[in-house]
Amino acid sequence: MNLVLLGPPGGGKGTQAKRLQDKYGLVQLSTGDMLRAAVASGSEVGKKAKAVMDAGQLVSDEIVIAIIDERLDQADVAKGAIFDGFPRTVAQAEALDAMMAKKGKKLDFAIEIRVPDAYIVERITGRYTCAKCGAGYHDKFQLPQVAGKCDSCGGTEFARRPDDNVDTVTKRLDAYHAQTAPLLPYYDKKGSLKLVDGTMDIADVTKALEGILDASK
């Protein structure tokens, strides 16, 4: 089984991909991880990617597809893959479909974890961590049991990521919508698009995703 997880930054894709990976034996494929692995392996396509990255340029869709092609031939992906962060455009989706068709494979689902922008802004801008041990907290959803004191290590200093501000998050969301909006009708026409409410609790989102995957068996 192969699926694409779509959803905004901060929408919980990574968490859910890990849960599905653990339950179904699927392999989460993130383009960043695959690029780094290809470069480290010294393969032909990895060398091409390294040359482009060293020149400070964006890696082309053609190279990314070649890296995915190579990755799908590896034994650990036999049960299927979860594509996280790719495709981002219709052109990439078409290239991915064509490449998989050559292998006799297909994408079974494109699942959008849908979360309203206001939720994402609240989730991301409220995040902070213990400066000492890295334990995560949130202004609204996960406060320390004792105000100003880390539950894990007792530290009293906390930090926020500079990018976790309203302006930056809004720009990232705008870019996501501009890129991804055309993918939804593309996959809908193919009959593979499914929607899951990402505002539910993490466990409930997982149940909804499992329901989609289990129904296809």
Curated annotation (Swiss-Prot):
The primary gene name is: adk
Keywords attached to this Swiss-Prot or TrEMBL record, sorted alphabetically, are: ATP-binding, Cytoplasm, Kinase, Metal-binding, Nucleotide biosynthesis, Nucleotide-binding, Transferase, Zinc
Where it sits in the cell: the answer is: Cytoplasm
Q: Which residues are recorded as binding ATP?
A: 10-15, 127, 200
* Region ranges (NMP): 30-59
Residue ranges of the TM segments: none
**Is NADP a UniProt keyword of this protein?**
no
Query: Tell me, which GO biological process terms does this entry list?
Result: AMP salvage
Q: Where is region (LID) located?
A: 126-164
Name of the protein in its database record: Adenylate kinase
GO terms, molecular function:
adenylate kinase activity; ATP binding; zinc ion binding
What pathway is it annotated to? Purine metabolism; AMP biosynthesis via salvage pathway; AMP from ADP: step 1/1
Matching Pfam families, A to Z?
A: ADK, ADK_lid
